[in-house]
A protein has these predicted regions:
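Alpha-helix-loop-beta-strand connector modules within alpha/beta enzyme cores
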Residues: 47-61, 107-118, 188-197
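A cross-family glycoside hydrolase active-site/sugar-binding cleft signature
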Residues: 33-37, 61-65, 86, 135-139, ...
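Anionic-ligand binding region
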Residues: 96-127
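Conserved Radical SAM active-site core
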Residues: 1-82, 91-93
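Alpha-helix N-cap and loop-to-helix initiation/capping positions
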Residues: 12, 39, 99-107, 143, ...
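Conserved radical SAM core fold
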Residues: 3-4, 41, 66-69, 87-105, ...
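Non-cysteine beta-strand/loop elements that form the S-adenosyl-L-methionine
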Residues: 77-92, 162-170
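Auxiliary Fe-S-binding modules of radical SAM enzymes
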Residues: 116, 120-228
């Protein structure tokens, strides 16, 4: 499956995708990570069902920006063990400006609600590996701590403060981004303010990051090829 611009990746059949999942399991993978699989939903569903029939038993992780319909998420029920949804924006003006995502928040919060209905909050095994459930991720953006606070308020109201969170600080400006608001990194003061507000609300399970997480090392090496 190629990336959106069509310059990377390769087409694979349903049988091949199913086989790749089984090969990853055979090589010791902890889970199968489906990153934004929505454009290929029908093929992914078919491949998952085939792989599970043929012995796939490691957790299946669904990694998403959450701009998805409840119907789409519901179609994966019983197949997905772990959901890692982003909750990017509370203010729809930011969603439209930065991501061209009209009505982002209402769509995303309903999709996440369906994920939680299916698998609950994230659970870890005895070795500390996630095996089931949901952890909501939020990337704190420069100049947008006010929106982070609104996101945290909304999560606390909708899901309670036991909802697992990941507050990320890794925003990295790239030359292709022309919006001046996103031309700089997050400051320590901004991130600390976001974390302090999160804790003041009483959230009990929060992953945080140091600002040393900023940089291109967090950008996946899309050009690397792994032979399976």
């Amino acid at each position: 499956m190629a990336l959106q611009d069509g310059t990377l990746g390769e087409p694979v059949s349903i049988d091949r995708l199913s086989d790749l999942m089984l090969r990853l399991q055979g090589k010791g993978a902890h889970n199968i990570n489906l990153v934004t699989p929505t454009p290929h939903r029908d093929a992914v569903l078919a491949a998952l069902k085939q792989a599970k029939k043929d012995g796939l038993s490691i957790p299946i992780l669904y990694n998403t920006g959450s701009y998805e319909s409840v119907e789409t998420i519901r179609s994966y029920e019983g197949l997905i063990d772990l959901y890692l949804p982003d909750l990017k924006y509370r203010d729809d003006r930011l969603a439209k400006r930065f991501s061209k995502a009209e009505g982002y928040f209402s769509v995303a919060i309903d999709a996440i609600s369906e994920m939680i209905r299916q698998v609950g909050f994230m659970q870890l095994d005895e070795s500390g590996l996630a095996v089931r459930g949901v952890r909501i991720r939020h990337l704190v953006l420069p100049g947008c701590v006010f929106d982070t606070r609104a996101i945290l308020d909304a999560v606390a109201e909708r899901f309670g403060t036991d909802c697992p969170l990941s507050l990320m600080s890794q925003y990295t400006p790239i030359p292709e981004c022309k919006d001046p608001a996103l031309s700089r990194r997050l400051t320590q003061r901004e991130y600390d303010s976001a974390v302090e507000y999160c804790l003041s609300l009483g959230f009990t399970d929060v992953f945080t990051q140091g600002l040393d997480s900023v940089g291109t090392s967090y950008t996946p090496p899309f050009h690397d090829r792994i032979d399976l």
